[in-house]
Every structure is written in structure tokens, then in C-alpha cells.
Amino acid sequence: MDSILVKGNGELRGQIPIAGAKNACLALMPATLLSDEPLTLTNAPRLSDIRTMTQLLQSLGAEVASLQGGQVLALSSHALTDHRADYDIVRKMRASILVLGPMLARDGHAVVSLPGGCAIGARPVDLHLKALEAMGAELDLRDGYIHAKAPAGGLKGARVVFPLVSVGATENALMAATLAKGTTVLENAAREPEIVDLARCLRRMGAQIEGEGSSTITIEGVDRLGGATHPVVTDRIELGTYMLAPAICGGEVELLGGRIELVGAFCEKLDAAGISVEETERGLRVARRNGRVKAVDVMTEPFPGFPTDLQAQMMALLCTAEGTSVLEERIFENRFMHAPELIRMGARIEVHGGTATVTGVEKLRGAPVMATDLRASVSLILAGLAAEGETIVSRVYHLDRGYERVEEKLSACGAQIRRIPG
């Protein structure tokens, strides 16, 4: 099992290109199941989760070709040969549930295993299922699988009110509704840029959608969808992660392809901590203003609030901030598993339920640490960049699910980082 060795060695300077959004691409890929015409995705990220979704779609009979080094995905679902998403593939990634709505909408039936992915709290799929039931689907959970069947004549438009904001449930319902008979209204829908990106792609395919980016999305079902070519939106989580690298280490880094509107609430916290963020012709330039970072309080919220997927990385920054910071996790349970590993590096962190109190120290110390999930893995790398001595991060297969060429991108800015094959 691979690990990553990081040596703390001062400031970072240079440019880092930001990839297409993993979470957007994982929703866009199943959209091919809605049509018998080709779907081409450009600016695709090159990640293990994308390969897993490719395997899943191919197991259903879809064709997926990776072109231009993986940055272009050519997909086609002319004739599906199977409507069963098996546990062996689905267990690797929670986004696998997103094939359910499209298959049900297009062909009227689907069998999908309950999903896997990062071990972060409960993260139930009941919101997905209730939305599909509102459209008339008959659902039966048995033997670890969701057996779904549409009513005669297909899914029907419905008013769906999500009791909690859910990105995945919004995506599943949005895709299913494009082929449902009549009008579907999604209320308390997720507002994330990935939802907007999916809606834009579906509209290119012929869907009739209004209101994406707001909490109410209206979809008028159509008889069929066509093909399209669509660029995947910039990954705001990768963007925020690499914005924190010069914030933690000092120096100045330009993030190519970055846009303020993708990370507005995050930028507000960086500004309060003493980090400068400026727009450039090609992206965003980030630098630490003067001296030590200042403590700030953070509460994770659905978009446009502070993203839960940047909480672990923000904690790494605040470990060496001047003063005491409070981080409140409002999205997922059990999402402070990186805290004990940061404590091994000398951080002062106390966790009580969904709240972590971080008292800044002058310097972290390198240590062997273990990644517990995707975002925790990169937070430990960031901490290692600013620590004295060497940090070895093990179990970095988590990292490969969400960050492409992380060692190459950071070393190009002066970081001492390399992968140790396991």
C-alpha cells in the first residue's frame, strides 16, 4: 500500500492547474444512461473514482472511452445489457447510487446495491428513495439491494420536498425527472455548483430545467434526451485545498482555472485568517499577508456556506494559527477522524461531538500518520508541508480517489514530497 513522504521546507511559489470536479463528473457520467445518443465530457479529472464509475457503467452495457490522457470521456448507452449494479463495484463508492434514477427513468426498472465510499457517519440513501417514490417508483430493499420499478407508463412528475439538503438525492431526482411524465418540482434542493453543472449538461441533452442554483428546481419531463458535449466544472474542493498550501507554508501560488464564486464562503474565512486572495486573468492568486495566521471559527453548511469537504484542510491551517479556533461540523457525523493524526504531529485539538476546538501552536512536528478518508489524507499532507522534519502519510489510496497528481502539482511549487510505493 503506497504512502507519501513530505518534508517541511518553507514557502511555496508557482502555479497549480485545477482539474475538473470529481463530484460533478461522477453525476454527469450516469446521465449517459438517460439517452441512446453519445455524451462527451471534457475537462474530466483523472481519478480512481472516475475509473470506478467507468467500470460500473460498462457493467451495465454502456460504452466508456477515455481519451486525451483521461481528460475526455466519450460515453454511449445505446443499448443497456444489464440493469443490476453489483455490490462488488458499488461498495467502492457512494456515487454509484446515481445510476438508479437514470435507469429507472429510461427503462423502468433497476437493481442497485446499497453504496460504499468514505466511512463518514450514516450518510443514508433514504432521501434518494423517497424522491423516486414520490414519482411513482415501487421500491423494495432486500439482500442489500434496492429493487426499483417504475409504474406503467413511466415515472410521473411530482412535488418533492427534501427534509434535508442532499446533493446526491437532488442529482438522482433531477436526472429521473427529465424523462418523467409532467412537471416535477424539487424543493429544498441542493444549490452546489455541481448541481448547476449537471442541469446545464442535461439541458444540452434536451431537458427542460429551470431554477438550478436555487433551492427550487422545476423540471418539465420530455419524451427523450439526445447527445451532448459538456465541459466539467472546475473542482472547487481541489481549488480550496491548494489555496491552503501557500496559506499554511507561506509564499504565493496561482491556481489556474480558479473562480471566486466557487469558493466564496471559504475565501471569507481565509481573509479573516490573514490570507490574500486575488483574481487574475487565469485564475486566483493566494498568499499569506504577514506573519502568523489568525484563528477563525468555521461552521460547515450546504453551499453557498463553508464546504464540509474543506473542513479537514482548514483544520490543518488552524493548527498553527494564533489563538483558538472552533470548527463545527454540521453536515456529516464522525468527520473529525483526522484530528488524532494531527495531534500526533503536535496539534492541540479537542473534539466533543460535532465540534472541534483547535488551539494554535508555533510549529507542527513531522510524524508517521494514517489517512482515514479522502479529505483527511490531503489535510495531513498540508500539515506535513509546514511541519518540522518528515511526515509519512500511509493509506493514501484515499487520496487517489479525489486528487490527481498531487505530488507533481505541489513539487512544481517547491514542496518536497514523493510517493513511496507499497
Curated annotation (Swiss-Prot):
InterPro entries reported for this sequence: Enolpyruvate_Tfrase_dom (IPR001986), Enolpyruvate_Tfrase_sf (IPR036968), MurA_subfamily (IPR050068), RNA3'P_cycl/enolpyr_Trfase_a/b (IPR013792), UDP_GlcNAc_COvinyl_MurA (IPR005750)
GO molecular function annotation: UDP-N-acetylglucosamine 1-carboxyvinyltransferase activity
Protein residues bound to phosphoenolpyruvate: 22-23
Top-rank taxon, per record: Bacteria
Pfam family, any one: EPSP_synthase
Pathway: Cell wall biogenesis; peptidoglycan biosynthesis
Gene3D superfamilies the record matches: Enolpyruvate transferase domain
Enzymatic reactions: phosphoenolpyruvate + UDP-N-acetyl-alpha-D-glucosamine = UDP-N-acetyl-3-O-(1-carboxyvinyl)-alpha-D-glucosamine + phosphate
Alphabetical UniProt keywords: Cell cycle, Cell division, Cell shape, Cell wall biogenesis/degradation, Cytoplasm, Peptidoglycan synthesis, Pyruvate, Transferase
One BP annotation, GO: UDP-N-acetylgalactosamine biosynthetic process
Residues recorded as bearing 2-(S-cysteinyl)pyruvic acid O-phosphothioketal in the entry: 118
Gene Ontology terms: cellular component: cytoplasm
First-tier enzyme category under EC: transferase
Known EC number: 2.5.1.7
Positions that bind UDP-N-acetyl-alpha-D-glucosamine: 94, 123-127, 309, 331
Subcellular location: Cytoplasm
Primary residence: cytoplasm
Active site: 118
Family statement: Belongs to the EPSP synthase family. MurA subfamily.
PANTHER family from the UniProt entry: UDP-N-ACETYLGLUCOSAMINE 1-CARBOXYVINYLTRANSFERASE (PTHR43783:SF1)
Function: Cell wall formation. Adds enolpyruvyl to UDP-N-acetylglucosamine.
Protein name, per record: UDP-N-acetylglucosamine 1-carboxyvinyltransferase
Lineage of the organism: Bacteria, Pseudomonadati, Pseudomonadota, Alphaproteobacteria, Rhodobacterales
